């Protein structure tokens, strides 16, 4: 089973923390990391926007990654959240075992 990292941005720290806690409680993620105070530049509705956001990294498995993404998308405050998932190419075996166990 592969380990995946999902990267997603939020407008508020409390939104990221609340959604992260739900993902862990539902066993869709083994753990989440929230990174505060990132600066994002993007085009939205014809304008260039520079905004303060926070980012969340979700640690999950190949068997839960699609469910986790759907849950994030359904519960995210943004109209179009930026959600990306990456398969980890090299993972410590003990960490992988822990992630798999936490998401069963």
Kindly give the residue locations of the regions a language model identified.
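Positively charged, small/polar-rich N-terminal and surface patches that mediate targeting and assembly
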Residues: 1-104
